[in-house]
């Protein structure tokens, strides 16, 4: 009986310690090409780091979109989806995920919905969460 009470007290004490457990990064998106390079480090806790700056909050809709993108794009990495470079592209994207990195030109979104969604996420996150022009 005494051991059970001690175990219970210990587990309650540990639960209240506020262990500093950090959420995993969902992905690192880099956009390069004309204009300034953009980097977005998206964390599962609902934060984003823009161009190596300070951590900023990410809105719930953007966080849900980022989680969905991470899952979808990671499946593309696993299936070894590749894109040819295009002379018509303005930007090139690289998305680093747990299973590897997916690289694509901005023209790839015309044929792949998830790629168009990644490009849209980059624009919305840059404007809304980072306060950048996009």
Language model feature labels by segment:
Residues 18-28, 77-134:
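Short, well-ordered, aromatic-rich surface patches in folded extracellular/luminal domains
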Residues 33-39, 88-90:
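Short, surface-exposed coil-to-beta transition loops
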Residues 13-16:
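C-terminal motif of bacterial Sec signal peptides marking the signal peptidase cleavage site
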